[in-house]
């Protein structure tokens, strides 16, 4: 199987919802809102196995200095194939002129993945969130 990567936002609401639900992310229950959010994101790189959406990374940026990686996800059927790492490296390359690439890790067990790709834990920072 050959995985193809693209920055074209050519995915449907259903494809996106299926991917997010495959990893049990609640936003997959809101396919239209999720699709709209992705379409309005600074950058989305997706991974495809034929016409099946199997991975995705989403970035928001200020166009000059800082970007934030919001999502990195890969369908469980495709775990262990280096897809997430490839997506992350594509973002690092795209934003190499920026001062900072930040990521909010949803689960601390995933920190080592980012550390393998050169990210450092900021001991003096604490992530916060307001939820409606």
Question: Model-predicted segments: where are they?
Answer:
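Conserved beta-strand in the GNAT
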Residues: 46, 52-61, 65-73
